[in-house]
Amino acid sequence: MSDIDAYAQMLLLSNFLREPALRSAIQTLQLPAGSRGLDAGCGIGLHTVLLAEAVGPTGHVTGLDLSPEFLALAQEQAKTRGLTAQSAFQEGTVNNLPFDDNTFDWVWSVDTLFPTLANEPLPALKEFVRVVKPGGSVAILFWSAQKLLPGYPFLEARLDAAFAQMAPYMAGIRPELHFLCALGWLREAGLGDLSAYTFVADVHAPLSETVRQALIMTFQMFWGEARSKVTPEEWAEFERLCQPDSADFILDRSDYYAFLTYSLFRGTVA
């Protein structure tokens, strides 16, 4: 399996966990029927199709991504859901959008503007503002928290403190560039009428096989490289709880419950 295919599979699996929170976010935005929007950093189109459903048959959503391979998969998503007339996909970068001023009624972007030492969010946000009509909105969202190991809060806190789980937030980045400070970014980009919300997606036993696989993948994605950051005893406990072949595999518990959150930051173009 290629790196592209592996990452696409990860996105598909994790979507079973994320989609309820993102649907709630879309509902809160109350996107006007018939409006035209941009999904900036659309990946394989999983959110683009939800947005296209929300704006209805007279609306339209353009998905933008750097990866032509992801865009091809996004087109398949739209085709499968019968939404090809309401969606289009274009290659491009969020820092230099290939669209005219005042093209869209709104922009939506999920897990795309995480700052790094080499890339800050403001240039992309200014581009979002440029392509949105006056009175339109810009909404950016981030996976902001999760609790996946019920009954083991200290172990989960230690695992979460491992650098691999904190990525893409990196040591050396100014505190105001943490994604939970995104209202400040929106204000600096010239947006007004700012608001922020957090949405929860939760799962509980009995788990479907798809959700089990998504959680197993999430355990590995967050904590699979944390061994050097925790004690040998903590790592042994992690493996006891999070390895599917363990007699104490946590997903086999009849009382298993977990949740994740997405935080949305929204502003209006003057």
Describe each region flagged by the PLM.
Residues 16-33, 50:
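Conserved alpha-helix/loop element of class I SAM-dependent methyltransferases that forms part
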Residues 180, 195-270:
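Conserved Class I S-adenosyl-L-methionine
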Residues 122-134:
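A short glycine-rich, Lys/Arg-flanked "PGG" loop and its adjoining helix->strand segment in the class I
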Residues 57-58, 132-138:
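Short glycine-dipeptide loop
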Residues 95-107:
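A short acidic, Gly/Pro-enriched loop at the edge of an enzyme's catalytic core
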Residues 38-40, 44, 48-96:
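Class I SAM-dependent methyltransferase SAM/SAH-binding core
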